[in-house]
Amino acid sequence: KFLLGSHVWMNSEKLENNSKLRTVLKHGTLSIGFIGLAETLKALIGEHHGESAKAQKLGIEIVKHMREKCDEYCKEYNLNFTCLATPAEGLSGRFVAIDRSIYGKIKGVTDREYYTNSFHVPVYYKTSVKHKMEVEGKYHAFTNAGHISYIELDGDTVNNVDAFEQVVRIMHDSDIGYGAINHPVDRDPVCGYVGVIKDVCPRCGRREGEGVEMEKVNCYDCSNC
């Protein structure tokens, strides 16, 4: 409603109260998204795609079929249907709660508070960066409406640029269309320093639980102005 009412989409300024939307929708995309591939595979064969080649093969077949249906709809309706690897942070929790109320708690499927986003390997599954990217990279070509694969680093890469570059190259070699690298960022609530803080804040020298003189805090605040 916002996009149409604000005339963001081409030809939306010509719409009247009883107008059909085809003339406007044809300029945009109609994305069919999905979450929970990992849980789907657990329900079907007892393993997700990070655990076995058999599950990976089935997962690829499922997502490939979804993409093919989107392509069929494009030709049938002459509209831009696309397949979306959905990052549904809110929906993943809502859907699993609904399914649990209907089907009960199923191990590996509805026993957590969320479904895994899109085709991601579950975050609770211990694996290597290389394996995770190799598994997820197979799905990027099918999800033409958007996709993302990311890894979580447990340390600071500022002093280890080679490791950071290696991760990027692994993503490239795994056909990752859109990759992200998350790393920890701390914030000192007293002096406001943002970065990786180990035992001592590199700006004010404060340790966890210690205070700092107000004059120093004011000095830090002024330096950020």
Model-derived regions: residue spans:
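Long, C-terminal-biased catalytic regions of enzyme "large/alpha" subunits
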Residues: 1-225
